């Protein structure tokens, strides 16, 4: 059987004339040195969650620097009440899916995967085994939640070649201990503790730090105090080195009410890629988040 001849550009088709193909822009793969250069230049880092190959490819094409395979997939994909029920096998499955999506389009995004609940609490050795599972699935970095008690684990992983993103403030894996989804670090004592924990994690080698639902002033202070650790805010104001949102929240397709810190970029975009591009542009230009609307 003879293969069909590809339709050339500018040829007439039943649907109109095909436009000439535009060359894909040449982009360098995102790396830790590249993220450091961006921060030094004052350019905001953009991050979104991704859970499958197609959305990963679209987000990468829209210019997102970092993709997070978050255990939030338990809530937005599996319908679980929290992230606690997400397994390591599930995280590896979705990480591999996202990695394949990036590979198919020669994507450049930096890929981070969450270490799920129960996969690192026993100590550094357990964390290393779990991290190896996610790195072998295609992750470039792993993320774990928790304060100073995780610092020895962070150091252990970094010394063995595993880049680590830490996570302070509201830590969804321990939401039951925190009494619900509440802003963290509001009291003077809590703010001091968060600053101290952030310094510990930077000293242990964490290259990135997610700050979730933390007062904007505190998040800015922490960011200024961490020259070697890039802060990524979600509900933490505009003063962090970058921003992250759950993909479903920024597309307005979650199962409940959109959180205060999110914005529905799909409402005016008309397409998924357009919405993600609008998010990237808004973060880069300093229009999102608006501290008066999206922060505490």
UniProtKB/Swiss-Prot annotation:
Source organism, top-level taxon: Bacteria
Annotated source species: Paracidovorax citrulli (strain AAC00-1) (Acidovorax citrulli)
GO biological process, one term: pantothenate biosynthetic process
Residues that, per the record, bind 3-methyl-2-oxobutanoate: 71-72, 114, 143
Official protein name in the record: 3-methyl-2-oxobutanoate hydroxymethyltransferase
Principal localisation: cytoplasm
Residues that coordinate or bind Mg(2+): 71, 114, 145
InterPro entries the UniProt entry points to: Pantoate_hydroxy_MeTrfase, Pyrv/PenolPyrv_kinase-like_dom, Pyrv_kinase-like_dom_sf
Alphabetically ordered keywords of this record: Cytoplasm, Magnesium, Metal-binding, Pantothenate biosynthesis, Transferase
Protein encoded by which gene: panB
Record function comment: Catalyzes the reversible reaction in which hydroxymethyl group from 5,10-methylenetetrahydrofolate is transferred onto alpha-ketoisovalerate to form ketopantoate.
Record has Cytoplasm as a keyword: yes
Keyword set includes Magnesium: yes
Localization, UniProt: Cytoplasm
Active site annotation, chain numbering: 212
GO molecular function, one term: 3-methyl-2-oxobutanoate hydroxymethyltransferase activity
Compositional bias per record (Low complexity), positions renumbered to this chain: 1-14
Cofactor(s) annotated in UniProt: Mg(2+)
One Pfam family of this chain: Pantoate_transf
């Amino acid at each position: 059987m003879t293969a069909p001849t590809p339709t050339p550009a500018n040829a007439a088709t039943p649907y109109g004339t095909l436009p000439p193909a535009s060359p894909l822009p040449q982009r360098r793969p995102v790396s830790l040195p590249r993220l450091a250069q961006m921060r030094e230049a004052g350019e905001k880092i953009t991050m979104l969650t991704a859970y499958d190959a197609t959305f990963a490819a679209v987000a990468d094409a829209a210019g997102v620097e970092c993709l997070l395979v978050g255990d939030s997939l338990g809530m937005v994909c599996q319908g679980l009440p929290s992230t606690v029920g997400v397994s390591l096998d599930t995280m590896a499955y979705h990480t591999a899916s996202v990695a394949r999506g990036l590979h198919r389009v020669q994507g450049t995004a930096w890929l981070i995967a969450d270490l799920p609940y129960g996969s690192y609490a026993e100590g550094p050795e357990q964390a290393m085994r779990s991290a190896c599972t996610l790195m072998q699935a295609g992750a470039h970095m792993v993320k774990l939640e928790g304060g100073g008690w995780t610092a020895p684990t962070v150091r252990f992983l970094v010394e063995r070649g595993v880049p680590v993103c830490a996570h302070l403030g509201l830590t969804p894996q321990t939401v039951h201990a925190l009494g619900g989804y509440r802003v963290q670090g509001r009291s003077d004592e809590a703010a001091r503790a968060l600053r101290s924990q952030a310094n510990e994690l930077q000293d242990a080698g964490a290259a990135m730090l997610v700050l979730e639902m933390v007062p904007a002033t505190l998040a800015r202070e922490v960011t200024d105090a961490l020259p070697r650790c890039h802060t990524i805010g979600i509900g933490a104001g505009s003063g962090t080195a970058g921003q992250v949102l759950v993909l479903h929240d920024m597309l307005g397709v979650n199962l409940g009410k959109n959180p205060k810190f999110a914005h529905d970029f799909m409402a005016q975009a008309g397409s998924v890629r357009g919405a993600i591009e609008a998010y990237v542009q808004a973060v880069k230009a300093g229009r999102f988040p608006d501290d008066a609307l999206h922060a505490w």
